[in-house]
């Protein structure tokens, strides 16, 4: 059987669970995604056929990288990382991701400075007890929460950067890919997390 028409969610579930490989999709979204930097087997992994131990091994291999090479990342690699991100699941299969690329070490440094300026302003506001308590009095406890939980660590991070050049935000990364979602999506925060 070939799935066509407007009723399909194009999620691929019917293909994944069919025991006889009897279903195909006409929709081009399920054609092979071409990658220039690596190859992969273009076959669905049948339910129950993926080794749990391999998933556990993958999850245990996860690490935060804070040691980056002092060279820019090829544009092709950044584009392919985004392609991989678009294969992530999303709430209601809406796939409303927004990928923003900061492509060079110089751009990352400029972006980091802008973020630092934002947090310096936020720290000044949260350190103003009249403003903080006034907002709390009118039912907005966000600034008080920020001051209690983040003020000191953000202050230290900003001082480290300004006085010693230590980048605790991007750790000297050569490029950054930020993933966001549209507010009107069914679960934008979760979708963005799954695509990273």
Name what the model sees in each region:
Residues 80-93, 97-99:
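Non-catalytic interaction/regulatory modules that flank or connect domains
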Residues 62, 80-86, 175-196:
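Small-aliphatic-rich amphipathic alpha-helix that forms the alpha element of a beta-alpha
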